[in-house]
Regions:
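Non-globular, low-confidence helical/coil segments that flank catalytic cores
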Residues: 2-273
Length: 273
C-alpha cells in the first residue's frame, strides 16, 4: 500500500543494419536500435549526442541488455520511457535507473500497477527521480536538429487492459519518421485514428509483438510503413507474431528480432540508407 501511495505522488509530480556494425553517430545521423531482448521490447534511439530508451525488456534478458549497452559505451540516458507496467517491457528498468544517469523519466499515468512497476518505482524513489506523465496532446519533445517526438496516446486515464496505456509515439527526423506503439491494442489504435493524428511513418514498431489484437488493418493503412519491425522471442509460447499480422504486412519489409537479432536502422533525415 505504501508503494502504491508513493506511486500516486510520483505520477502527479537510414540503412537497415542487422549486423550491428557502423554504430557511431554524428550530428546528421539518427540510429534506432531494436535490441533483441527476447519476448519483450527495448528500443534505443541515438541522435544529437542524446540517448533515448523506450522500455528495457524482461528481467531474464538483463545480461543481453547489459552487453549491448556496454558495447555502445553508454553511461547516460537523456530520456527513458516506460510504456506500461508489464514485466516484458520494464523488467530491467531498475537496472537502468540504478546504473545509469537518467535525466528525464516518462511513463503514462496508470490506475493499476504491477510488481514490476512497483520495483521500478522504488528505484526511482531512491534516485529521487520524478515520473513525467506521457499523454496524448502533450507538448512535443524537441531533441534538436529537426528531431521531434510527438505523443498520440494514451487518450484515457482508465483502461481495463494495461497494454492500452502504451503511448503511441512518433519520432520524426526531417523527412523520415518512426512510429512506436508498445503493446497498444486495437482499442487504443482506434482512439488515435479517431483523433485524427498523422500516423504516416517510414518505420513501424509492430504492436504487442505481432499479436492479432494489435496492428489492425485500419491502423496499418493509416501508418503505411515501408519497414515493419517486430520485437519478439524465438519459439515463444504466445504464437507471436501471428499469421494474421504477418499477412497484413505483405507490403512492408519485415525485420524480426527472433530471426535477425539486434536490428539497427539509420536515418540521415532524408532517407533510410
Amino acid at each position: 500500500m505504501f508503494v502504491n501511495f508513493i506511486l500516486i505522488i510520483l505520477l502527479f509530480q537510414c540503412s537497415i543494419n542487422i549486423k550491428e556494425n557502423n554504430l557511431e553517430t554524428n550530428k546528421n545521423t539518427m540510429l534506432v536500435h531494436f535490441i533483441d531482448v527476447g519476448q519483450g521490447d527495448s528500443i534505443l534511439i541515438q541522435v544529437n549526442k542524446k540517448n533515448l530508451l523506450i522500455d528495457s525488456g524482461p528481467n531474464e534478458s538483463e545480461d543481453k541488455l547489459k552487453k549491448y549497452l556496454k558495447k555502445l559505451n553508454i553511461s547516460k540516458f537523456d530520456y527513458v520511457i516506460a510504456t506500461h507496467p508489464h514485466e516484458d517491457h520494464i523488467g530491467n528498468m531498475s537496472y537502468i535507473i540504478n546504473n545509469f544517469e537518467v535525466i528525464n523519466f516518462y511513463a503514462p499515468k496508470v490506475e493499476n500497477s504491477t510488481k514490476a512497476f512497483e520495483t521500478m518505482a522504488e528505484s526511482l524513489i531512491r534516485k529521487d527521480l520524478k515520473i513525467k506523465i506521457l499523454k496524448a496532446n502533450m507538448k512535443s519533445i524537441d531533441l534538436g536538429n529537426n528531431v521531434i517526438i510527438d505523443v498520440f496516446s494514451p487518450l484515457s486515464n482508465r483502461y481495463e487492459d494495461l497494454n492500452n496505456y502504451s503511448p503511441i509515439i512518433k519520432i520524426s527526423y526531417k523527412n523520415t519518421s518512426f512510429l512506436f506503439t508498445g503493446d497498444a491494442e486495437e482499442l487504443a489504435e482506434n482512439e488515435v485514428l479517431n483523433a485524427g493524428f498523422d500516423l504516416k511513418c517510414d518505420v513501424l514498431k509492430i504492436g504487442h509483438h505481432g499479436s492479432s489484437s494489435s496492428t489492425s488493418e485500419k491502423f496499418l493503412n493509416a501508418s503505411n510503413p515501408s519497414i515493419a519491425v517486430i520485437s519478439v522471442g524465438e519459439d515463444n509460447t504466445y504464437g507471436h507474431p501471428t499469421d494474421v499480422v504477418l499477412s497484413r504486412l505483405k507490403e512492408a519489409e519485415i525485420y524480426r528480432t527472433d530471426i535477425n537479432g539486434n536490428i539497427v536502422i539509420t536515418s540521415d533525415g532524408l532517407s533510410l540508407k
